[in-house]
C-alpha cells in the first residue's frame, strides 16, 4: 500500500517504501523474475503515471487545443499519432541520463513511458493537426472542419391535372 494516500510521506515511510521496492531484474521467490507472478511496483507506478499525465483540452473558435505537460522532454522523446481515424494518441518516454562516473544519492524524478488518448470530435480536420513543444509544454492543435452549409429547401413544382 502506498503510504502517500494517507499523508504518511515522512522520511521514515519513504525510506521503508524504497526498501520494499525490488528492482525488476532481481529474482523473487522461487527464482522467477516477476517476484511471485504479480505485477512489479515499477509496472504499477508506470501505469499510474500514464493515467495521470496532466492535460488540458480547449475548444477555440477554429480549432481544438490539447495542452500536455512534458517537462524535460525533447521532440525526439514525444510521439503524436492518430489511431482508428479519430483517436489522438500522445506518448513518449522520459529516460534517465546514465553516467558511469556519477552515483545517485537520491532519485525522485519520474522516468518511464507515458500515454494519453483523446477521442476527437466529428468536426475535427484529420488533415490539419500540428504539434509544438515549448518550455516543457506540448500543444497539439487540431483545426475544425468548416461548418456544413445549410441545405436549401427543394422546391417541387406543382402540376395542375
UniProtKB/Swiss-Prot annotation:
Instruction: Give the Gene3D superfamilies listed for this entry.
Output: 2.60.40.790
Q: InterPro entries in the record, alphabetically?
A: A-crystallin/Hsp20_dom, HSP20-like_chaperone, Small_HSP
Q: Carries keyword 4Fe-4S?
A: no
In the record, biological process GO terms are: protein complex oligomerization; protein folding; response to heat; response to hydrogen peroxide; response to salt stress
Q: Which Pfam families match?
A: HSP20 (PF00011)
Locations listed in the record: Cytoplasm
Q: Which UniProt keywords apply?
A: Cytoplasm, Stress response
What's a Gene Ontology MF term here? Answer: unfolded protein binding
What GO CC annotations are associated with the protein?
cytoplasm
Main location group:
cytoplasm
In which domain of life is the source organism classified?
Eukaryota
Positions of the sHSP domain: 46-161
The entry's family comment says:
Belongs to the small heat shock protein (HSP20) family.
**What PANTHER family does this protein map onto?**
HEAT-SHOCK PROTEIN 20 FAMILY MEMBER
* Name of this chain's protein: 17.5 kDa class II heat shock protein
Q: Source species, please?
A: Zea mays
